[in-house]
């Protein structure tokens, strides 16, 4: 027997049933996708789909060459034909904006876009953190005021309500100011942290030289006291940034959305400015962040487009659904409405015709394949979870009848005229 080939570590199959080490099912995932589709439409967002492979330079320019994502986590390879450096996308915003700039999508009006799909990072796999993971992203492009900042947070809170997990999530916010304000804060922060360089861990020493703001994001408990006493970016904000942040918070207050101000919230990507935020939970262990985002007013220009202030966020689907599966609610309709079975010569073809007719009327029908006994077929019907069983036997072919069985026992088994099949099932379903 040939040796089995296993999936790549940290990249999961999505099956119709739960797995030992990955509890999410394809049906649960599909129900979430359907919910997201309806949710985005209610806010006027249009879907965009981009390739999973991009030129590496896109992420170097947008995310930042010195970030952990670009420096350590991307899957990068060379195209064999022209040695062009390519990478599997580690996040969705850069790809979305590349497409917007390339196709001149902002030429006459702002845009509200959303995407959903797989991302890739070379990380140590653990619960809620995978090498292939999936995100839903929201991007509001060409909007400058704090009103859009508040709207997309209200939008995310609305989704948490729909999924039944609002009470398990906490909103943290901060302002990163503009480029000049961050530069002034960076100088003060470097001066402060340099005094404690001998106490920093190796990762923080590296960040001190490449992206000192990320030192404040450390999870090392030995560095918390140092970081808590560090210069705060909020103290370097100018009047315009302060006003934007104050109006943003006032809108959240007016919407009744509770939040915590976290001056150490910086996000992991270099393109953020002004408003940043995260939705966190204490129900998933170390992987506390379920959703995060912020403003990236200079990124479209950085990628070759005309200046367009913008804001967006992304949520990790795996983490989110782990939370929903344990604490929330999501209606999953994986079972068919009808399990169609047959017995005797000629009944197999006729049951196909009935099944097709029912599907045309909106019923989900699973048709039995093979020629087992009626008892065995009925067992499969029961295992399928179908609400109704349709039985076509040879002796019913001549007189044009079928047998219907309500698997929940709400109706007695009946033999009905084939012409009344759809109406009878519809009445039973609506009863």
UniProtKB/Swiss-Prot annotation:
Which Enzyme Commission number(s) are listed? 6.1.1.21
Top EC group: ligase
Q: Which domain of life is it from?
A: Bacteria
Task: List the catalysed reactions.
Answer: tRNA(His) + L-histidine + ATP = L-histidyl-tRNA(His) + AMP + diphosphate + H(+)
Could you tell me the Gene Ontology terms of the biological process aspect for this record? histidyl-tRNA aminoacylation
Q: Which CDD domains match?
A: HisRS-like_core (cd00773), HisRS_anticodon (cd00859)
Q: Which Gene3D superfamilies match?
A: Anticodon-binding domain (3.40.50.800), Bira Bifunctional Protein, Domain 2 (3.30.930.10)
Kindly give the InterPro entries that the UniProt entry links to this protein.
aa-tRNA-synth_II, aa-tRNA-synth_II/BPL/LPL, Anticodon-bd, Anticodon-bd_dom_sf, His-tRNA-ligase, HisRS-like_core, HisRS/HisZ, HisRS_anticodon
Report the GO terms under cellular component.
Answer: cytoplasm
Compartment(s)? Cytoplasm
- Which Pfam family, any one, appears in the UniProt record? tRNA-synt_His
Molecular function as annotated in GO: ATP binding; histidine-tRNA ligase activity
**Which UniProt key words apply to this protein?**
Aminoacyl-tRNA synthetase, ATP-binding, Cytoplasm, Ligase, Nucleotide-binding, Protein biosynthesis
Which HAMAP family does the UniProt entry name for this protein? His_tRNA_synth
Cite the record's note on assembly.
Homodimer.
Give the similarity note: Belongs to the class-II aminoacyl-tRNA synthetase family.
Official protein name in the record: Histidine--tRNA ligase
Q: Which organism is it from?
A: Neisseria meningitidis serogroup A / serotype 4A (strain DSM 15465 / Z2491)
